């Protein structure tokens, strides 16, 4: 156990629907350190309710702010109407990095909007870096993100397994894609990251399936994690039993829409998580899921929606 008491409490806030209208890129060769004032020793992970998609905001020590993916297949203008307003509500005026796990629309549609708004001067929010998986072939959506970043004067970084990015005391290790990844199967070659902050460990798995989970188990000595962003919105073909037996997540968050037609999350995946003794939070039932971390404990806040 990394914490004597990892999840201090699960707080439920009821909302009725009718009321809701060093960047040290390790690369084993070079590194740049992003320096800044340490306002307070904390980490805040917000898994936003973007419908059938992913959008996660990380706030690190009151100084660094990151977006991991940002898109939806069933909500239009999710960047304009959900992600940007959320950032403003948190007083965030700068994103130090936007991490894109892969280029499916349900992970990038909102990010495209944000970059377009930045490029046109339609938002006061600034973006420093766009971090993409290092693929040998760059699909159309990948090239579009590059172009939007260039117009917005946002630096593009490409990362692969073995790279490390540090923000203050938070360390992001890139576990996937492996060197030489082509980019043909964007799900299985998606960016996978492990976040370490003090004793806390979180795993962000994009849309990988069991095939890549097995490769990760072979390539790394994966250990227990406190937080797991469940891959592919809870698909039956991800989050396998063998993988869960290794990473043993204390908390798992599934981002999906209540009206999705894919059967997400699958009963099989939910059963595997339950058998692993994992606390499950689902954005289709809870809305946004907020995880607050300090050096000793992890607090979770979720919203029960009628």
Protein language model regions, located:
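Non-globular, low-confidence helical/coil segments that flank catalytic cores
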Residues: 1-306
């Amino acid at each position: 156990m990394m914490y004597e008491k990892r999840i201090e409490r699960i707080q439920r806030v009821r909302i009725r629907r009718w009321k809701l209208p060093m960047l040290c890129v390790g690369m084993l060769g070079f590194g740049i350190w992003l320096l800044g004032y340490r306002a307070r020793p904390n980490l805040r992970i917000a898994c936003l309710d973007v419908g059938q998609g992913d959008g996660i905001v990380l706030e690190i020590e009151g100084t660094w702010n990151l977006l991991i993916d940002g898109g939806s297949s069933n909500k239009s203008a999710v960047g304009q109407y959900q992600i940007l307003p959320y950032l403003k509500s948190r007083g965030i005026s700068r994103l130090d990095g936007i991490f894109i796990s892969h280029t499916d629309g349900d992970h990038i549609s909102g990010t495209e909007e944000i970059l377009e708004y930045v490029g046109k001067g339609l938002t006061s929010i600034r973006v420093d870096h766009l971090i993409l998986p290092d693929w040998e072939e760059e699909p159309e959506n990948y090239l579009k993100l590059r172009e939007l970043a260039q117009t917005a004067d946002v630096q593009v970084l490409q990362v692969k397994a073995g790279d490390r990015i540090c923000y203050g005391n938070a360390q992001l290790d890139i576990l996937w894609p492996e060197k030489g990844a082509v980019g043909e199967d964007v799900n299985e070659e998606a960016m996978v990251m492990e976040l370490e902050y003090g004793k806390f460990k979180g795993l962000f798995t994009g849309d990988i399936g069991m095939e890549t989970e097995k490769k990760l188990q072979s390539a790394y000595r994966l250990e227990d994690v406190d937080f797991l962003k469940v891959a592919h919105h809870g698909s039956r073909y991800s989050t396998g039993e063998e993988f869960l037996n290794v990473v043993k997540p204390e908390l798992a968050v599934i981002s999906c829409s209540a009206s999705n037609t894919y059967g997400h999350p699958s009963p099989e995946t939910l059963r595997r998580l339950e058998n692993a003794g994992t606390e499950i939070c689902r954005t289709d039932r809870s809305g946004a899921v907020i995880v607050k971390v300090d050096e000793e404990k992890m607090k979770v806040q979720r919203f029960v929606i009628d």
